[in-house]
């Protein structure tokens, strides 16, 4: 797998299946990386077939202590961009969760990281996991973690920045939560971004329903940024319950 060093959102990524395809794919990825990020740096890594994209939420403090807040499964993607996220992962076992959590905490403490962060892994069908990257910020999908462990990540990040210490306790899901990204796109035109004015906006609600957004009726979606305009999150006692709520809200 070829990847851009400054990449994100699937830009500058190419899978190479044959050695004679490497040079062409490298040049193509490099050009895309330069156009997208102004940086032509590239690297290669092992290609994992049929991977699961599973990330571990971590928090570290100024004393060098870190904890994890379990995983998020971000495997449902389009063009290497996340569409839905959930926790706990239906692919996970308790053993794998503990192993990945321990690895994430060890890495976080080794670099003396402070604040909330996410360590992302690819997991193969045999449940071997491979480090991809660390996102040193709050993730778009952080609400599902907050919902299942009753933990305010934003508040915790502010406390850590103020010098407070974390408890050091690792957290595990008590509920099931799913997030769907709401994008301003045209499904009849290859899902291209569709900027413009929102004439009417109706917000869903109810028990176990959360909507994070900045838009409103009359808001004009600009053409310059990512097409995501909202995040719809449902939480229930079971995965089936969270899915049922989500389907009822988006009218599928």
Language model features: what each stretch is:
Residues 9, 16-250:
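ATP-dependent carboxylate activation and anion-phosphoryl transfer catalytic cores
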């Amino acid at each position: 797998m070829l990847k851009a060093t400054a990449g994100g959102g699937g830009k500058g990524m190419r899978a190479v299946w044959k050695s004679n395809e490497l040079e062409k794919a490298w040049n193509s990825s490099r050009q895309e990386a330069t156009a997208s990020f102004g940086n032509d740096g590239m690297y290669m890594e092992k290609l994992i077939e049929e991977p699961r994209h599973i990330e571990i939420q971590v928090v570290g403090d100024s004393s060098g202590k870190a904890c994890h807040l379990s995983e998020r499964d971000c495997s449902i993607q389009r063009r290497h961009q996340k569409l839905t996220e959930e926790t706990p992962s239906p692919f996970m076992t308790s053993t794998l969760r503990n192993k990945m959590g321990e690895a994430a905490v060890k890495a976080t403490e080794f670099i003396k990281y402070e604040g909330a962060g996410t360590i992302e892994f690819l997991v193969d069908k045999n449940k071997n996991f491979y480090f991809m990257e660390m996102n040193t910020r709050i993730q778009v999908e952080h609400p599902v973690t907050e919902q299942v462990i009753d933990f305010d990540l934003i508040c915790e990040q502010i406390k850590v920045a103020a010098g407070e210490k974390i408890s050091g306790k690792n957290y595990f899901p008590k509920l099931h939560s799913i997030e769907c990204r709401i994008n301003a796109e045209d499904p009849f035109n290859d899902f291209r971004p569709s900027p413009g004015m929102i004439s009417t906006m109706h917000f869903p609600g109810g028990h176990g329903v959360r909507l994070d957004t900045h838009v409103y009726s009359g808001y004009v979606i600009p053409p310059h940024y990512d097409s995501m305009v909202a995040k719809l999150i449902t939480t229930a006692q079971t995965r089936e319950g969270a899915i049922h709520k989500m389907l009822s809200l988006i009218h599928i």
